[in-house]
Amino acid sequence: MNNSKQFLKYQPLLEWLAKHEAYISPKLYIASSGVAGDGIFSTFDIDELEVLAKIPRRIILSPRNSRFGDSLYTHFNESNRSDDINFDNRDQVGLVMLVITVILENITDSPWNAYLNTLDETCMPDSPLLWKDKTCLEGTSMLDVINTNLRVYKNQYDQLVRPYFYKHADLKQLCPKWNQYLETCVLVQSRCFYVNSYYGLSLIPFFDIFNHKSGPAIASLHCQESNDHKGDIKIEFISFQYIRKMSEIFNSFGNFAADELFTQYGFIDTACKVWRVDMTMIAYETNRNFYMEWIHKKRIINTQELLVTPTTYANDKSETLRSVMIRQPMDLYIITDHGPSYGLYLYLFFCIYKIKFQKCDMNIVMLTKYFNEIWAVFIAHKEGEKEKVVAQLSGFSFYCKAIEFLQMLCQKRISRFKNGGLTAEAYKTLLCDPTLKRENRSRLVLQIFYHELNLLEKSMQETIYLCTENFED
């Protein structure tokens, strides 16, 4: 592998990898990336499906390979049985275990020292989770996402991390402070890989130098589904397309929305076209009783009995859009190139149902039947089938009321920005300022305001069109 002098910090790592029989293609070299930090580039043309690197599974940094692994798995299995703790997300628990592993290996005499020494301050993403002052994001949906993530991480720290350290007398003094844990969590989350069901989330030396970007992966990890970590099975990093020499080689972020990527990596990926605005707080503030009843009802609604399910609703979307919509189908948000999410549409229909049938007992069978009637109008309207819409004028009337309710929610959501009434177009003009550098936080904030306002304004224009469209020939 070719390296320039300023990247001598990687030399001990490369020697350690060679000692453990890892393979790094001689066509690769490490250099400063135009995206973030360091990256891996090609010195020669690389063919499709060419192996770029192989790392033995026994040397990846994972709770499975760590001397602390047994005590971690025992602690987390016991915590999972506790009535006071409920972490049913496997990736969340896997991340917490990996973060604890990294903290312990980093402050003790570790076999991964050669790798851990490369994770200096230049590797730390400028994640908004670590920003001391977040007032510049006040009113944005992005800030809601950030605060939600912080609450989740703090909850994990209080309920899982501290109890683990304090349970073991020899580890108690090593328990990280909350800020130290959060910093390590941000670093690890930005660099870890899902290996397989046995190893889960892990740090893979060298592989994590490859930068990410949205869209199809240029190269990606491949690992057999096996728990044989004592053998010489290797994890491979393979090119998925032809790569020209002197090009940076990217892994893919996966299919995530812009808010998810920003909180994890600390920059706006221009290739990511999927933005969301969360409408949950506005829905709650507008009518708390409706919202709280919806929270209860949505748990018992059998979506398979609905005319359109979360899966079919997202079938004709792009891969990223479809992935985001299916992962969180019942969340209340507005999304790029689509408008209201599946869950938000159902909530709107539910609210109109409540207004019409205030004194009636809300039977789930009736509610499902009502949803299907409205969905029939919704689909016919979206597909321009005027005859079907006219044939269901009663349903169309309810549909229009739901759309009007959405318009009101959008107006209220825009008022939360507290930005003096600036429009998306005004922010677009500000973004043309040549003095704003790509990595400048001010530019990031302007981009967030622009995309979120643009999404809300377009959604409002769409609702006006839907409610005023003339169906006469």
Swiss-Prot record:
- What PROSITE patterns would the database entry show? SET
One annotated GO molecular function is: protein-lysine N-methyltransferase activity
Q: Which GO terms describe its cellular component?
A: cytosol; nucleus
- Where is each SET domain found? 26-254
One GO term under biological process is: ribosome biogenesis
InterPro entries the UniProt entry points to: SET_dom, SET_dom_sf, SETD3_SETD6_MTase
Q: What is this protein called?
A: Uncharacterized protein C16C6.01c
